Design a protein with these regions (language model features):
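ATPase catalytic-site recognition across NTP-hydrolyzing enzymes
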Residues: 1-25
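Anionic group-transfer/hydrolysis microenvironments
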Residues: 23-25, 51, 80, 160
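Hydrophobic/aromatic-lined pockets within catalytic cores
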Residues: 26, 38, 164, 168
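Coil-to-beta-strand transition motifs
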Residues: 26-30, 42-43
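Short beta-strand scaffold segments in enzyme catalytic cores
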Residues: 31-37, 161
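Mg2+-dependent endonuclease catalytic cores in nucleic-acid-processing enzymes, primarily RNase H-like
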Residues: 34, 40-151, 170-171, 187-189
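Acidic, Mg2+-coordinating catalytic module of metal-dependent nucleases/exonucleases
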Residues: 150-171
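Acidic two-metal-ion nuclease catalytic site recognized across multiple nuclease folds
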Residues: 167-189
């Protein structure tokens, strides 16, 4: 995704809703915890903070979230790590929620996120590194890119997808309900 780098002031963005996401890693891949804000009216996604490290056990992840001051926030964690999410709850992160994933959810999440202008705090160096290196798989026969991201340089991006997943599902339902209202009124959308 295209993005703009700048120093972001959390206080100036405090009127926008916050979203938190966690992608687990360990030895080869880092764990990534991100804080983002969404401005739906202006179609902007702000990436405010990241905590990205390798070799983190769940107790260290919980302590980092507490140290950042987000232990009481709703955090969306990778549902492939239900056991880790439960352990974080036991370690004092009570509002971590398993992200609902299904067929096509990665592409759906990316497509939603691409509708927004990304503004990344320049201190989020790992997120910036991923955005610079994120790429798509190529068809072996045609050498054309296909709608399937390469599974590298994606941990921060996955955490952003998780953080915003429920927001976009809620938006989808609101838009769907609006269309249903128009249909019922005879507008035939």
């Amino acid at each position: 995704p295209k993005y703009e780098k700048k120093i972001l002031n959390k206080d100036k963005l405090s009127h926008l809703p916050s979203f938190f996401g966690l992608d687990y890693g360990f030895i080869n891949d880092p764990s990534a915890f991100l804080h983002v804000k969404i401005d739906d009216n202006n179609k902007k996604l702000y990436i405010l903070e990241e905590y990205v490290r390798k070799n983190l056990t769940n107790d260290k992840i919980a302590n980092a979230i507490k140290d950042l001051g987000y232990a009481k926030e709703e955090i969306r964690g990778d549902s492939a790590e239900k056991k880790s999410n439960q352990e974080l709850r036991n370690l004092g992160i009570p509002r971590i929620i398993d992200v609902k994933k299904g067929p096509g959810s990665v592409m759906q999440g990316i497509q939603y996120l691409l509708q927004y202008d990304w503004i990344v705090d320049e201190r989020c160096v790992k997120t910036i590194e991923e955005l610079e290196n994120y790429t798509w798989k190529k068809d072996k026969k045609t050498n054309e890119y296909i709608n399937d991201p390469v599974d590298s340089y994606n941990h921060c991006i996955d955490a952003i997808r998780y953080a915003t997943s429920n927001h976009f599902l809620t938006l989808d339902k609101k838009q769907s309900n609006s269309f249903n209202i128009f249909r019922k009124a005879g507008f035939g959308l």
